[in-house]
């Protein structure tokens, strides 16, 4: 089985491309989505699926992403869905929308694919319900502190004025201990003024700006 091909693109057509590998020109059928990203003379790597069916010439189908290949191969297991129709589904919907439609039982989404009518769309959703699922969202670490979006802006402003990053961070923490509502507001200008005021009045805890005399 040919799982992938890597080589120089020799030709890009409306429905296929030719990739030169070790002196051989390999014809790869692909969706417009994949073909649009290929350039003649450039090196590419395509995930491939080799399809050989009775009474039909074997064909090699290529995909820019492994997820596209997975959608294609799984759809071939649905009764009445051939490689051309499966390829069209990958092109029209894309992997994420195809998974989302199946998870939601949205058979109408598949009727937008050429060659798939209402009956076939319902069959696709039913047969793939337990085969194509949406990926689990990333799990956030428990008790992981969230850095406010304004923090980096205030630190950059303070270091630009000559304060060290260490003193800038300490100044923010100490200033907000006395005025915690500023952190909730997220007002960069007000937070910066408060930190500068704290840095200017604190004694023995911070250094003067390194870039100023």
Swiss-Prot record:
Cited SMART domains: HhH1
Domain II, as annotated region: 65-143
CDD domains xrefs: UBA_RuvA_C
Location of region: Domain I: 1-64
Cited InterPro entries: DNA_helicase_Holl-junc_RuvA_I (IPR013849), Hlx-hairpin-Hlx_DNA-bd_motif (IPR003583), NA-bd_OB-fold (IPR012340), RuvA (IPR000085), RuvA_2-like (IPR010994), RuvA_C (IPR011114), RuvA_C_sf (IPR036267)
Compartment(s) where it occurs, according to its Swiss-Prot or TrEMBL record: Cytoplasm
Biological process according to GO: DNA recombination; DNA repair
Region Flexible linker, annotated ranges: 144-152
Domain of life: Bacteria
Keywords, alphabetical: Cytoplasm, DNA damage, DNA recombination, DNA repair, DNA-binding
Record Pfam families: HHH_5, RuvA_C, RuvA_N
One GO cellular component term noted in the UniProt record for this chain: Holliday junction helicase complex
GO molecular function: ATP binding; four-way junction DNA binding; four-way junction helicase activity
Domain free text: Has three domains with a flexible linker between the domains II and III and assumes an 'L' shape. Domain III is highly mobile and contacts RuvB.
Subunit structure: Homotetramer. Forms an RuvA(8)-RuvB(12)-Holliday junction (HJ) complex. HJ DNA is sandwiched between 2 RuvA tetramers; dsDNA enters through RuvA and exits via RuvB. An RuvB hexamer assembles on each DNA strand where it exits the tetramer. Each RuvB hexamer is contacted by two RuvA subunits (via domain III) on 2 adjacent RuvB subunits; this complex drives branch migration. In the full resolvosome a probable DNA-RuvA(4)-RuvB(12)-RuvC(2) complex forms which resolves the HJ.
General function of this protein: The RuvA-RuvB-RuvC complex processes Holliday junction (HJ) DNA during genetic recombination and DNA repair, while the RuvA-RuvB complex plays an important role in the rescue of blocked DNA replication forks via replication fork reversal (RFR). RuvA specifically binds to HJ cruciform DNA, conferring on it an open structure. The RuvB hexamer acts as an ATP-dependent pump, pulling dsDNA into and through the RuvAB complex. HJ branch migration allows RuvC to scan DNA until it finds its consensus sequence, where it cleaves and resolves the cruciform DNA.
Protein name: Holliday junction branch migration complex subunit RuvA
Gene responsible for this protein: ruvA
């Amino acid at each position: 089985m040919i799982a992938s091909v890597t080589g120089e693109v020799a030709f890009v057509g409306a429905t296929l491309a030719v990739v030169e590998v070790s002196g051989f020109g390999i014809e790869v059928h692909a969706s417009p989505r994949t073909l649009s990203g290929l350039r003649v003379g450039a090196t590419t790597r395509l995930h491939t699926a080799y399809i050989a069916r009775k009474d039909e010439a074997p064909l090699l189908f290529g995909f820019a992403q492994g997820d596209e290949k997975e959608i294609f191969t799984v759809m071939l297991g649905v009764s009445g869905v051939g490689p051309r129709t499966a390829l069209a589904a990958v092109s029209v919907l894309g992997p994420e929308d195809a998974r989302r439609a199946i998870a939601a039982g949205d058979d109408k989404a598949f009727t937008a694919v050429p060659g798939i009518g209402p009956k076939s769309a319902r069959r696709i959703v039913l047969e793939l319900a337990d085969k194509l699922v949406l990926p689990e969202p990333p799990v956030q670490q428990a008790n992981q502190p969230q850095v406010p979006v304004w923090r980096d802006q205030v630190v950059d402003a303070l270091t630009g004025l000559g304060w060290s990053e260490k003193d800038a961070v300490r100044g923010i923490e100490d200033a907000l201990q006395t005025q915690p509502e500023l952190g909730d507001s997220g007002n960069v200008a007000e937070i910066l003024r408060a930190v500068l005021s704290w840095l200017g009045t604190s004694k023995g805890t911070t250094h003067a700006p390194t870039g100023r005399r």
